[in-house]
Amino acid sequence: MRAETRPDFFFIWSGDRFSLLFRIAVSLVSCHHPDARVVVYVVGPSPTSVHFQALLEDGTAEVVALDPAEVLGRLPLALSGAADVYSRLPRASHAARSNILRYALLHDHGGVYLDTDVLTVARFPDLDGVDAAIGLETVWSGDRRRVSGDRTVWMSPTTCAWALAYSAVRCDSLLASGRLGVAGRIDRFGHAWTELQANNAVLASSPRSQFIAEVLAGIGEVDSAIRYSTGPTLVHDVLSGTNANVRVFGPDVFYSIPPGQSFRLFEDVTFRLPDSAVAVHVTASNHETRVARMSATDPCARPGTVIHGLMDADAGMQQGKGRVTAG
């Protein structure tokens, strides 16, 4: 089934574990864009969780049952290889399947795609006149080798430096709520073991976008058995070689916290989003137990953290108190 009109923002969901965090992600988009059409596409059976039911009842988004075969069938013949790859993916490969569907939907109707663990904190910039828009994220420089199965990455001196830095920041966040300032001190040397990579958790395009068409064409050339091969790795490689008019945002806009430090959103009371932040990627896959347990009375985050602040702000929004902000 297609949305009645072209959505301005859309999410894709499959599975039953629709948590409070994901409902808040949808609500925050509507909060900052009250006139926008927000769609949640559901693949397979609708979730039965109370949070999904709340989403249905509060009217912040249109929920649309999505038929992958129909969506992929609308792709031009030259891009039909993406449908072939999708059909070969195991049903449990939710992330890889979602990657392909988001590209197909963007190609079909354009708009802004967001992962359900992306929390909007400000109004999105005007993207008129661009073919597509994407954000860069700070990642460990050895991660691509790791996910491809290259075990020699663990013997690299930069990997040892990264592991020590991670451990120091993790201990400060867990034991001292970030008050020792370890992350700020280490960031000065982070260029030695990190690099910038495009991520597809936030992705915008016009209909029939050249960039998205190039991404869809590239799906048939990757090894879909390798994690991220249809996601960040693919969009980064395409971005590196495209001549399309793509607006590229720095990490401060969507990914101000590196995925390997996403625990700080729940634990570090000193971390603040930059003024330029439009959204923050929680990387919920790193916090599955915590995200599953989150409730209105227990945000599973320390008071003073970004997540706690957004939870409080969302509660205020639900009570009609106005615009959501976060520290």
Q: Could you tell me what each predicted segment is?
A:
Residues 1-98, 116-327:
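Glycosyltransferase-associated regions of secretory-pathway enzymes
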Residues 99-110:
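Small-residue hinge/turn detector
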Residues 112-114:
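Short aromatic-hydrophobic micro-motifs that form the base-stacking/packing surface
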